């Protein structure tokens, strides 16, 4: 089911699916985790151009609306391309370069659609902490599809 929902959002651009995914995150995640400013994991520039939208951004916006929380797009990707298709060792050895575009909120809820190795979330958390975040909690809709 998770694979179908992620695929519907990412590849068929069925944006209402993002709200359903956000509802599941809200329902399943412990309440203490779901606080702070919502920050989506930034997309690769090539993927954003090709798709014309940001699936993680849509999920983050839907979650922010459900939680009535602020949303901040304060991260961007720099180079290194796709993680999809890389083996675990490659992903860990060559994490994406993530940079903060602005100062980070003190408390952040980092949102992505799928967790594979955690290297992208780790890179995002490091970038957020480097510009002022003191608490970074990550949530994803699915793990390894």
Give the residues covered by each predicted segment.
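A structural signal for isolated positions on well-ordered beta-strands in alpha/beta enzyme cores
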Residues: 37, 72, 109, 136-139
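Short beta-strand/turn micro-motifs composed of small residues
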Residues: 40-42, 112, 140-142
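PRPP-dependent phosphoribosyltransferase catalytic core
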Residues: 122-145
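Mobile, glycine- and charge-enriched loop segments
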Residues: 101-117, 135
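Extended interfacial segments that mediate partner engagement and assembly in macromolecular machines
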Residues: 1-62, 84
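Short, well-ordered alpha-helices that flank and scaffold nucleotide-derived cofactor binding pockets
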Residues: 23, 27, 61, 65, ...
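Short, glycine/charge-rich flexible loops or terminal/linker lids adjacent to PRPP-binding catalytic cores
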Residues: 45-52, 57-108, 144
